Amino acid sequence: MVQTASLARRVVLAFTILTTLSGTGQLWSVPHFFQPTAARNSGITAQAERLVAAMSDTELLGQVFLLGYFGQTPSPQILDWIRDKHIGGVKIFGWNAENLQELGRSIGIMQSAATESGLRIPLFIATDQEGGWVRHIKGDTSITPGNLAIGATSLPYDAYYTGLYIGKELRSLGINMNFAPTVDIYSKENAHVIGPRAFAEDPLTTAP
């Protein structure tokens, strides 16, 4: 019972985030960060709680899984997991994104599988599109500097607009979650895993 309640809370949170993100609209003013009103936030949470209450244990468990697939098109296995196990999301890797038009179609197929079965909950479609050397969606998408170069300018607008346009490109493909930016600090010169993915060595510069 405790484990089920914990899963339910996680699903409520995920649904609230997905619903909030889908309603942010165009963000052209700089800097502007979406601040949901208390009434809107309360309504979304209540909607998520009603949805979770209607889920079977299989649906509830499936919502905490984020899976991937090999190749350019969704495998029969991933589509089965979406329809029958009601997984919460799919991770897009570079090997899924060699053709952007095909990727867009594939995401549409997976979202249709999710929204035409069970409780019709849309998927989180996630990727890693940090800019710099971490860019899983290539093709005609923008080539941007790494975070270290952006941080060196000390211009928040550079960081803002880089993130804005990366987000717009991902959104046009149907990707609604980006595991970015990296907020680790640049603490060691030989920290090769982070390196230029960090904005700065100062935590206050990285996240003022």
PLM region spans:
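Bacterial N-terminal signal peptides
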Residues: 14-22
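Bacterial N-terminal signal peptides that target proteins for export
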Residues: 2-12
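Enzymes and membrane/adaptor proteins characterized by extended Gly/Ser/Thr/Asp/Glu-rich
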Residues: 79-208
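Signal peptide processing junction and immediate N-terminal pro/mature segment
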Residues: 25-37
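Residues that cap or flank secondary-structure elements
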Residues: 40, 69-70, 158, 205
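Mature N-terminal segment immediately following signal peptide/propeptide cleavage
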Residues: 43-74, 83
